[in-house]
A protein has these predicted regions:
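Generic beta-strand/beta-sheet core signal
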Residues: 7, 54-56, 79
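ATP phosphate-binding glycine-rich loop and adjacent ATP-lid/helix-beta elements
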Residues: 21-22, 26, 119
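C-terminal lobe/lid and adjacent interdomain/linker elements of RecA-like ASCE P-loop ATPase modules
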Residues: 2, 58-146
Length: 146
């Protein structure tokens, strides 16, 4: 039996992960373990569902970079609402739901570069996409591609 203990903030004592971690923290600890383990094992596909919940900015950028590094070794499928994470993806799909009457259909659409810029701008700016959000999205994608 193994019990992980962590301190989620500086100056706090280590406590059992299962008792103190939020869903987002559990996801990020899982990501950290996968990054370390990836150098020693070959897992063909990893799936992360909102591993970036509760973070933003530079932390989201780091999570995106780590997912990209994992994707260099195998397939990574990640659901995200963070443009900083999505910008690092090798491939970007937009998921949406169409409701007609009493039924719903989920759609997945592969995005080309311009569609990625448009989607990142939507993620950054919401319903009102402006020239400024489009410029920011394009820059975000270019920086993540380097």
């Amino acid at each position: 039996e193994v019990e992980f203990v962590i301190a989620t903030n500086p100056g706090q004592p280590h406590k059992p992960l299962a008792k103190i971690a939020s869903g987002g923290e559990l996801s990020r600890v899982s990501l950290a373990i996968q990054v370390v383990a990836a150098g020693h094992s070959k897992i063909p596909t990893l799936v992360f569902d909102e591993v970036d919940v509760g973070i933003g900015g530079s932390t989201a950028d780091i999570v995106g970079l780590l997912l990209k590094q994992l994707g260099d070794r195998g397939q990574v499928i990640s659901v995200t609402h963070q443009p900083q994470v999505a910008a690092h993806a090798h491939h970007h799909y937009r998921a949406s739901k169409v409701i007609e009457g009493n039924s719903a259909e989920s759609l997945m659409v592969a995005l080309d570069r311009q569609q990625r810029v448009d989607e990142l701008a939507r993620m950054l700016g919401g319903a009102q996409v402006t020239d400024q959000t489009l410029s920011h999205a394009s820059e975000l994608l270019s920086l993540a591609s380097n």
